[in-house]
Amino acid sequence: PAITMHSFSDEYKQGTYEIIRTLPISPLQLVAGKFLGNLFIVLVAILPTLLYAFTLDALSDIGGIDWGATYGSYFGLLFLAACYTVIGIYISSITKNNLVSLLVSILVCLLLFKGFNGLSQLSVFTNGANFYISKLGLEAHYMNMSKGLLTAEDIIYFLSILVLFAIGSMENIKGKVKYIITVAVLISFNIFFSIYNFQLDLTKEQRYTLHESTTEIIAAINKPARVHLYLGGDIPPYYKNIAVAAATLLERFKQINPNAISWDIEIPGELYKDDALYQFYDSLSTLGLPIQRIQTENGPSDKRVDQLMIPGALIEVEGQAPIVIDLRTSKKYFKPYNIVKDIPEEDMEATANAAVSLLEYKFTQALYLLNRKVIPNIAYLTGNGEPVNLTVNHLGESIMHSYNLAVFDLKKGFPNPQKIKTLLIVKPTQAFTELDKLKLDQFVMGGGNIVWALDKLVAEYDSLQKTSGAYTAYDRSLALDDLLFKYGVRINANLVQDLNCAKLPMVVGKGEDGSPLIQRMPWPYFPFLQGNEQHPIVQNIDRVLSYFPSSIDTIAVAGIQKTILLSTDSNSRILSSPAVVDINSGKQEGELESFQKNHLSVAVLAEGKFPSLFSNRVSAVMLDSIKASTGKGYLEKGIASSKQVIISDADILTNQVDVKRGPLPMGMMPYEEYQFANHDFFVNTIAYLNEPIGLLASRSKQQLLRLLNRQKVEEHRVLVQFILVLGPLVLLGLFYLIWTGYRKRQFAI
């Protein structure tokens, strides 16, 4: 406005406007000339700011800045500057007073940028009306571009503003433009492109491009949801990034379905103090929200301050129990450290980056669960010695709120795949009869899914504690080998060890007073398992803790696709049955050299139409049993596609029980507070087997958290300050000298 206020008002005041009108130029040429001249001055002022972008790129840690997003932000700034310019020219064309032109232009620009957004916040606008009102203002469209997202809707909106005020200026000059028709055409264009919108995501990781399945799920939502993001207030920058990314994602959801979602970013407990504050946190913890104590650096002294925060969100839909989302990721990243250290320092920035990558999946899944019309039935199988005690407490709690969970006794009937979507077979200890296997086989032939969590050998840590330090693990004899082999999988009778493993407290000697010295030592019988990054079940999850796993081989079966989900690390070995479980395993001299194998499979996904184990050998008694129990005939091959996950360590899905604290989460040992990704692996497996395939597809999204390298900033602080403060001024000065020199030579007489 300060630049454009002289455009026409000075011409009116000095009487030169009449001279200009006598020149052979049209009103369009006159307005365009004024517009381009003023916009050129604005661009000259903006271009030196590119120096800031180059400086940030040089000081960044990994990957540099996202130049695609930077280009998009400059596009947005260009459109915004163009709109302010044309508005200023229009206001200048209706007044002779420069000051009036300046003040009115500022007011109009401010109202267009902030006014509609503020109006949309009023409580009277509900059911999506607030979203459409905010879209009338400049801010909503500029914010998309500033993030690197170019949409047809935003571009058409900005062009409409330019055309509207440019024609207004021409009308003031000529007075013969059909203004009403123009406005009607512009409104029609904006409505059309708001419905048939397309976008160009300039960001490097395509962070604003939602997966196709996500778009379909959000568009189909018919129950409005309210999201509470508890990441407001003074929190570390890496959590700020998560909050901003979550808000941006929810805004994209709202653009797809304005009635689907509303949200706010809250400061947890800002209205409470002392005991009331603790009660507030306790109530949120009861709902399942994560409560985390963090240490933040405060001020230039880098003094560390303890702080409670809630890195989670609560989604509410009327008439349903709310769903809690943990915005963190189970996959932890660590700074470079000496391997001798027990507890490496977590790289919070990198971990937060992994969390951002999972936001689309987490919010989409929660909204899908709250809006689905049919809830799948999952049955926990009993009848063959499966545990029904506290060791499967977390397993039940993990899925009982999202699915219909029940117990099915295999001895009492045939599981019906039309009623039961998935069977959970967890740690059976008794052999399966031929009739048992027939029941499971026909369940698979009918399209039912099964999770097999089996212990091939009898090997328990409790048994070791009752011996002198060693015992022999033997075959559990479950009689399932032929059934699994028919489906293309074989669990071998062995134990797998790996040097990347859990550390257990062990007696390593005696102190001076004769008391035992206890130290946590690596125990390769409890290896950490790595996920296959190419499959959504295990993509972007942390290590999975296992207890005495066996190796798995896959066998070619026509029409069956098999995918390795979990495997050991790069320093593994196999102990064939009868395998000795020794407290000192891996410690003997020269023994480490035997860990030469790598990536031994421990969990496998098999999917397709499976062949029946009993093909060509089903007896008349079996046929009668099937007919009597199901009312249907024997199925020789699968009539529908089925999915099976075979895990060679049942304890991956069970939890330990602490004497004082009770049942622990999956993947947590009593003497550690670190929780491995066993729970994530389980719930992702359940989602893959029971929900639409596309629901997990968004887990594959990767986003790089672009942060400054603090060491570079500190080393070059003075130089950076000098460049950022004086650099733009120097560039503007050089431009002035070059421009004035050019004009002198161009117009010299």
Map each language-model feature to its residues.
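Hydrophobic alpha-helical transmembrane segments
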Residues: L80-A81, H141-L162
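Transmembrane helix boundary and interhelical loop/hinge segments in multi-pass membrane proteins
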Residues: A2-R21, F35
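Short, surface-exposed patches at the edges or C-terminal ends of soluble domains, predominantly
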Residues: Q121-L122, A140-N144, L164-M170, G175-I749
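Transmembrane helix segments
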Residues: T95-S146
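Hydrophobic/aromatic residues in alpha-helical transmembrane segments
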Residues: T4, T16, Y52, V86-I87, ...
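Secretory targeting signals
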Residues: A32-N98
